[in-house]
A protein has these predicted regions:
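Conserved ABC ATPase signature
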Residues: 103-107, 111
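Catalytic Walker B motif of ABC-type/P-loop ATPase nucleotide-binding domains
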Residues: 128-132
Length: 204
């Protein structure tokens, strides 16, 4: 469950169902058990584009920018009118404005990740999902992405996040769910996620 303005983190060792959960929410998995509801609407059997139209924005694992489009074309491709527009995205990521006429394929890995986050925000989502948004990035870019996530939190953006950076998650997330073999084995607020629990379920 993710409430308005909350950051909720999914934790678990590799292969325990975190990304599968994300894919199921976004309509990218055809077979799973259980119910998924968003704003009182069942997401079961809905195509992914319909789920996006309901207000779920996904930043997928692996920096999937549209490589044959420019930065600007990427940002406006699926834009929805709202608070997040080109001006606000460029304020968040000044490098994107500098590179707006370049092809996405010419950007560095960190810049591509900024672009994918910006593109998701341009849909003005009610829920933003970040799947390993800082993985494989340089330490400097990771710091920048975490600062952006903090800004989004302060702007009351609802976020569901998967990330291996437990320290940053403990600072920012309101609530945690720990998954093991596709099932929730622990959930609670960050202040109750003790080192004992982390060691038991996460090995950290």
């Amino acid at each position: 469950e993710v409430k308005q303005g909350e950051i909720v983190a999914l934790l678990g060792r590799n292969g325990m169902g975190k990304s599968t959960t994300i894919k199921s929410i976004c309509g990218l998995m055809s077979e799973f058990q259980g119910e998924i509801n968003f704003n009182n609407t069942s997401l079961i059997n809905l195509p992914s584009y319909k789920i996006a139209q309901l207000g779920i924005g996904l930043v997928p694992e692996g920096r999937r920018a549209f490589s044959n489009l420019t930065v600007l074309e990427n940002l406006v491709a699926s834009a929805v009118e709202g608070e997040w527009d080109l001006v606000s995205i460029y304020n968040l990521f000044p490098k994107l404005e500098e590179r707006k006429n370049q092809l996405a394929s010419s950007l560095s890995g960190g810049e591509q990740q900024m672009l994918v986050i910006g593109r998701a925000l341009m849909t003005n989502p009610k829920l933003l999902i970040l799947d390993e948004a800082t993985e494989g990035l340089s330490p400097t870019i990771r710091v920048e992405i975490w600062k952006v996530i903090e800004i989004l939190k302060n702007k009351n953006v609802s976020i569901l996040i998967i990330d291996k950076s437990l320290k940053q998650l403990l600072d920012l997330a309101d609530k945690f769910y720990i998954l093991e073999k596709g099932k929730t084995v622990w959930n609670g607020p960050s202040k109750k996620l003790t080192s004992t629990i982390a060691q038991k379920f996460l090995g950290v």
